[in-house]
From Swiss-Prot:
Gene Ontology molecular function terms on file: oxidoreductase activity, acting on paired donors, with incorporation or reduction of molecular oxygen
Organism the protein comes from: Brucella canis (strain ATCC 23365 / NCTC 10854 / RM-666)
Catalysis performed (reactions): uridine(34) in tRNA + AH2 + O2 = 5-hydroxyuridine(34) in tRNA + A + H2O
Stated family: Belongs to the TrhO family.
Listed name of the protein: tRNA uridine(34) hydroxylase
Function statement: Catalyzes oxygen-dependent 5-hydroxyuridine (ho5U) modification at position 34 in tRNAs.
PANTHER family referenced in this protein's UniProt entry, alphabetically: RHODANESE-LIKE DOMAIN-CONTAINING PROTEIN 7-RELATED (PTHR43268:SF3), THIOSULFATE SULFURTRANSFERASE/RHODANESE-LIKE DOMAIN-CONTAINING PROTEIN 2 (PTHR43268)
Length: 305
């Protein structure tokens, strides 16, 4: 049991929800009434999101979600935070609960073989296994599994094209995929199986479940795991890390990254300096000045973020 005051729940469930629009308002009201913040996505294919609040509030929300007709038990990962990691609550209606942009992909019909965290090391140690990180390049940059391929994608929409262009690296291999919490791999493995590959596997519960269950001394994970909230990243045991966000481009920054000559808090980092004009950086510098003034007044320190 954690002593940290906020419970963070990452959840998803693929299930037919033809009336998903009607679920939005009750969910939003429940979250607002119980001080829950974060994001929930609803689509005809299911629900996905990460939220935070008191343990009791999150328990109420999960009970509400589980009781939605036709939904069933969501895939859940719990962690904890010292501060509220979200600024507001959003319940959004979407075409997909995780956007791949490929028509006809249905994880309920065909998906890879789930591998429990305790069995993951053995699978990826097999010399006939190719390990694929389905996340984005900025996530890979701060942590991944030993020997994992980086597809160098900026968004998940780019992943299908990477697979098509790299079929020769996958042919005749066991294909082991992983992502943060498991949802991207539901679609990634379904897509790859649809291309005719048979030996397709994915880490059940994703990196978060692995870091929670596998002891550090047995782990083959290197670095930190990027998360899409103000914690930025977590490590073994889902402990909060010292990774921060560049407030100009929202890339994750390690303490080493902040030593770069191109790093200026709130203005630029080595990753985005060349992508921005001097006018952009001047604007960001003014925003950062306002952030610091707001901090002195005790106001929101994340102006414009």
């Amino acid at each position: 049991m954690s002593n940290l005051p906020f419970t963070v729940a990452a959840l998803y469930c693929f299930a037919p929800l033809p009336q998903y629009e009607s679920l939005r308002e009750p969910l939003a009201q429940l979250c607002c009434a119980n001080g829950i913040k974060g994001t929930l996505l609803l689509a005809a294919e299911g629900i996905n999101g990460t939220v935070a609040g008191s343990a009791g509030a999150i328990e109420k929300l999960i009970a509400h979600i589980t009781a939605i007709p036709g939904l069933g038990e969501p895939e859940l990962k719990y962690s904890h935070a010292s501060e509220m990691p979200f600024h507001r609550m959003k319940v959004r209606l979407k075409r997909e609960i995780v956007t791949m942009g490929v028509e006809g992909i249905d994880p309920l019909k065909s998906v890879g073989t789930y591998i429990a965290p305790k069995d993951w090391n053995a699978l990826i140690a097999d010399e006939n296994t190719v390990v694929v990180d389905t996340r984005n390049d900025y996530e890979y940059a701060i942590g991944t599994f030993e020997g994992a391929i980086d597809p160098q994608t900026r968004t998940f929409r780019e992943f299908p094209e990477w697979v098509k262009q790299n079929r020769d690296r996958l042919e005749g291999k066991k294909i082991a995929m992983f992502c943060t919490g498991g949802i991207r791999c539901e679609k990634a493995t379904a897509f790859v199986k649809g291309l005719g590959f048979d030996d397709v596997y994915h880490l059940k519960g994703g990196i978060l479940k692995y870091l929670e269950e596998v002891p550090r001394e047995q782990s083959v994970w290197n670095g930190e795991c990027f998360v899409f909230d103000e914690r930025v990243a977590v490590g073994h045991g889902l402990a909060e890390s010292d990774v921060e966000l560049c407030r100009a481009c929202r890339r994750p920054l390690t303490p080493q990254d902040k030593l770069s000559q191109f790093f200026e808090e709130g203005v630029s980092c080595a990753g985005c300096y060349a992508e921005r004009t001097p006018e952009d950086r001047a604007r960001y510098a003014e925003r950062q000045k306002q952030v610091k003034l707001a901090e002195k007044r005790g106001a929101n320190k994340h102006i414009g973020s």
